[in-house]
């Protein structure tokens, strides 16, 4: 398993050593993703593949293919995948399909941590959240009680600035297309314009390209534009969508 964070089990507990070791672990995880592919392994409600064991098998297959990390949704999936792969697991909990639906509250984030996520992904927009907390308040609460890394899912440049100001470990363009939670269309590709703006304004920050990365060339273009790492999901792990793309092409 990915090493994660260490707490001395023997001898006198040293706060400074503990903090230094956690800082190193954080840095090692983020560095391990640089220039790499993160694969999102998710199935939508009601689909044949929506089962934790199935998701874990797919995650392991992606690891064998070269994925540097797995991004997954739901507590059972996080736990199952964490038990199957050696690479970091980015966990989230989707609630609904509109508004703030990616790990919308502190409660959801805590549950992802307890399920075994090495990194917790959450919506970084300034939209209202079910528990009334702001994004910044949620991040601060997580920092005060956990050593988990935080991935900020952003829609706009303002969201990216907010995430950087909150010292999030990974900052992603996940929501930039402003599409529904269930979106399997094959269309415009990743948001290279936002990616370039973010990497120019924040050089050295781990800006992740996510959203509509449908081909290897899309992934390469994102890295060339300055992405720290690239997330692809549907094009790799969602056979219903992939099949529909082929079928539609034959009908044109």
Which sequence ranges carry the predicted segments?
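N-terminal polybasic/positive-inside topogenic patches
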Residues: 3, 8, 12-13
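Alpha/beta catalytic cores of nucleotide-metabolism and tRNA/nucleoside-modifying enzymes
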Residues: 12-26, 44, 48-49, 191-252
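Conserved N-terminal beta1-alpha1 strand-loop-helix module at the mouth
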Residues: 15-114, 150, 158, 162-165, ...
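Solvent-exposed alpha-helices and their adjacent loops that cap or buttress functional pockets
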Residues: 27-32, 113-114, 144, 199-201, ...
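Hydrophobic faces of well-ordered beta-strands that scaffold small-molecule active sites
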Residues: 37-41, 70, 89-93, 120-122, ...
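Glycine-rich phosphate-binding active-site loops on the catalytic face of alpha/beta enzymes
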Residues: 42, 115-129, 171-183, 225-245
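Active-site-adjacent beta->alpha loops and helix N-cap segments on the catalytic face
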Residues: 49-51, 71-87, 99-107, 124-142, ...
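Glycine-enriched alpha-helix->loop->beta-strand junction motifs that scaffold or abut catalytic
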Residues: 85-89, 115-119, 144-147, 165-172, ...
């Amino acid at each position: 398993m990915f090493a994660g964070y260490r707490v001395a089990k023997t001898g006198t507990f040293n706060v400074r050593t503990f903090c230094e070791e956690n800082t190193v672990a954080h840095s090692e995880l983020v560095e391990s993703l640089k220039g790499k592919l993160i694969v999102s392994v998710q199935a939508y409600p009601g689909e044949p593949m929506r089962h934790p064991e199935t998701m874990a098998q797919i995650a392991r297959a992606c690891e064998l293919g070269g994925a540097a990390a797995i991004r997954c949704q739901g507590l059972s999936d996080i736990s199952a995948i964490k038990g199957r792969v050696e690479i970091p697991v980015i966990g989230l909990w989707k609630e609904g399909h509109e508004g703030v639906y990616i790990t919308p509250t502190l409660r959801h984030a805590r549950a992802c941590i307890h399920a075994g996520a090495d990194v917790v992904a959450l919506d970084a927009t300034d939209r209202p959240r079910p528990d009334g907390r702001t994004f910044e308040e949620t991040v601060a609460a997580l920092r005060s009680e956990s050593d988990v890394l935080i991935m900020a899912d952003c829609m706009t440049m303002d969201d990216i600035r907010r995430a950087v100001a909150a010292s999030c470990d990974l900052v992603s363009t996940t929501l930039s297309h402003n599409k529904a939670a269930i979106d399997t269309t094959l269309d415009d590709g990743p948001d290279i314009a936002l990616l370039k703006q973010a990497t120019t304004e924040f050089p050295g920050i781990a800006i992740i390209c996510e959203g509509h990365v449908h081909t290897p060339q899309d992934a390469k273009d994102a890295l060339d534009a300055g992405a720290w790492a690239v997330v692809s999901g549907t094009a790799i792990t969602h056979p219903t969508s992939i099949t529909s793309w082929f079928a539609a092409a034959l009908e044109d």
